[in-house]
């Protein structure tokens, strides 16, 4: 839903498809008072907690002035794209008309409830950059894993990667990473950036094995109780 007050504007959506009591709020323009008003509006509609987008600490001041506090933390990885990646281990294809609802089923199975983003979150990920693609690996004709990759100003973002647990440990995630790097290079990106949960050691090993370097900076999701 679009929230406006004069010049200020924000977008709000459910944090995921499992609960309406958690909401994600993305500020387009405005200050801490407007953020507070958005939290109040959401609380009146049953939202118990409002979460910010993931952001570095130097961009969080307006949220903290509105009463938001640290909630979740993400580590950031970066890869130089000058060298081509090894070939994927599976056939990876760009989906010309991805179905967010179908992808959300895989996403829900791949992540625990805290990190699920639901259909609306996947739509946001696809629209986060001017150029993007959904890459998929199919097993027996059914999508077993997907990646959402985008590019803007020569920087590529691996927005989301999920593999159905029934097909885990078969190299599908590795294939999607390599195909995402190849897509990014073909679309003019010079670096790729991604983030993941600090406790996701399997993902960390995969990314580091594929040439990603962990940066010192971390991203934080902030939260404020809505009611």
Predicted features along the sequence, with ranges:
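A conserved beta-turn-beta hairpin within the catalytic core of GNAT-like acetyltransferases
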Residues: 9-25, 71-73, 150-159, 168
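Acyl-donor-binding surface of acyltransferase catalytic domains
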Residues: 25-89, 218-222
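Helix-loop element at the rim of GNAT/NAT acetyltransferase active sites that forms part
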Residues: 105-117
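Conserved hydrophobic beta-strand within the GNAT/NAT acetyltransferase core sheet
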Residues: 50-53, 158, 192-196
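A conserved beta-strand-loop-helix scaffold within acyl/acetyltransferase catalytic domains
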Residues: 12-15, 120-134, 138-140, 144-162
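Conserved active-site alpha-helix within GNAT-family acetyltransferase domains
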Residues: 56-72, 170, 174, 186, ...
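Conserved acetyl-CoA-binding loop-helix of GNAT-fold acetyltransferases
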Residues: 29-40, 163, 169-182, 186, ...
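A short beta-loop-alpha structural element at the N-terminal edge
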Residues: 90-103
